[in-house]
Amino acid sequence: MSLLSIFGCGRAKTPEYPADRLSARDGTEFTITFFKHASLAISVGGKYIYVDPVSANADYGALPKADVVLITHSHYDHLDVAAVEKLLAADTEILCDRTSAEAFEMNCYTMRPGSVATPRDYVKVEAVAAYNTTPGHLQFHPREREDCGYVLTIGGTRIYIAGDTEPTPELKAL
């Protein structure tokens, strides 16, 4: 028996993460893959949208390149520039909140609550307010920071990405 047969072929296997395969209202199929904490990916027809990529949550160098990257806010557990850089292709679109935009030395589209963007023909992105309302948490996500959650529309189906937020009046409108 050779060492290769005992230990495999010598290549690391890409880790598998929990994923849900869904169909949008118009029949478009998409998959939501959860990595950890706030990091996830949505794949639509071989295109990938990554949300809050953080290196501690996934091996982004082993994953497909991003079509779109969404960043909700600049805290370390939601924004990791090194992870984003591993996902970049020549035409990757990065959408992020105002404070995260300051962390990038690359082009990104700054989103504020109320902003709407269509970075690709298969997805519309609406930025919604994400802030804390309870006294013990106000210092982490004050409303004036303009942190973002996102509502993605894919094939007529809306997907809410919360970011870090608590119940707010804006959530009732969703």
Features from the language model and the residues they span:
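Core dinuclear metal-dependent hydrolase active-site scaffold
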Residues: 3, 7, 12-64, 110-173
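Active-site metal-binding motif and surrounding structural segment of the metallo-beta-lactamase
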Residues: 55-100
